[in-house]
Amino acid sequence: MRRTQFRPRAVSDTTARSRRAGRHTKQPADGTGSRKLRSRVLIAGAVIVVAVVAWVGVQLLRPVPPMTLAVSVTTMRVLPGPAPRPDWPGQAEAAVGLPGTGLLGTHGGSQPVPIASLAKIMTAYLVLSGHPLSAGASGPAITVTAADASAYASDQRQGQSVVRVTRGETLTERQALEAMLIPSGNNIASLLARWDAGTEGAFVAKMNARARSLGLRQTRYADASGADPATVSTAADQFRLTLLALQIPAFRQTVAMAQVTLPVAGLTYNVNAALGHDGITGVKTGSSSQAGGCLAFAAARTVAGSQVTIVGVMLGVRATATQPSELDGVISASENLLSSVGGDLEHVQVIRPGTVLGNVSSAWTAGSAAVAATGIAVTAWPGTPVTVTVTPRPLGRRAGPP
């Protein structure tokens, strides 16, 4: 059966209507009348297509309507088991905890006390913040000035902890940091302060400004080395600062070194006698008649196949009949504290895969369960409060091709 084509039929109908009306309109021989009609049909069709495409485009580009998440998972929980009982150091201030988890606890009050050479943690933190050292880099050269050589001689006469330097000697930034943090040269702290800020006073102003910006409200610096007893802080503040400093690879590597060879001073050793024992990887010792024994320490532990670092701070440990050296006393006290908490860490899964976290709803649906795609585990001590925060990513995106 033969199909009737649409286009010829349209022309025939027009001619038939003209005849019935008694007016026969002769079509031009060249077919222009047919072409005009076809053009009108095609234009109308094009308008419809354009309108449809435009409508679809608007729908595709329309923003996804807002969606809301109602959290139903318990947001606060306590890890099971009895909490550890830290062996705190008598009347001294102390703090211990983990990166990411925070403080396990503090002891001995929260009054600012002298911190001796723990001030050098902030000095190193500021220097490395302003003059970062990449892995293996030595950094810029620092020439020992006449003022630096004079400060060395003056500090030595006062019985301070010093590292020998001579006028005209050249130290790299890394060597200067090693000289300050490993044998704990007070004169090197002042040298670095002058190199960074022009004068030690200007550098101390930067130290105090940074302490305020970090929220170390009980911390005040009077010098770059901590020899001045007016340089004071708390164990909790120094714990927070130590966590930040340990995030800098150059700092972390330096405080873990047992010894270093310097251009003029030669081979020098780390003052921290506990370094390398029981997983201890740093951080900084300090002692003076006003400050007593002070120590910021870090110790590695392996829990469920993963390495974690216990961080602690002790301030104001005093000499005793059994520990006549304040420095030996604070190292011994830190070992006792570490032993009392180091074996109690646990790896606990607080959110399992598939856990219902809440309900997602929108204007066009009653809601769907939001579930955890993966689990969340923490390494902490039993009895530690854990806060679970559910933060949704943007629910949806602009429609259309990726």
PLM feature segments, named:
Residues R2, Q59-A236, L243-P249:
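Active-site-adjacent loops and short helices of periplasmic peptidoglycan-processing enzymes
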Residues L42-G57:
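Hydrophobic membrane-insertion alpha-helices, especially the h-region
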Residues E93-G102, A222, A227-V255, F297-A299, ...:
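Penicillin-binding protein/beta-lactamase superfamily catalytic region
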Residues L104-P114, G159-V162, T281-T285, C294-L295, ...:
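N-terminal post-signal-peptidase region of extra-cytosolic proteins
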Residues A146-R157, L262-Y269, V360-G367:
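Short, mixed-charge aromatic SLiMs
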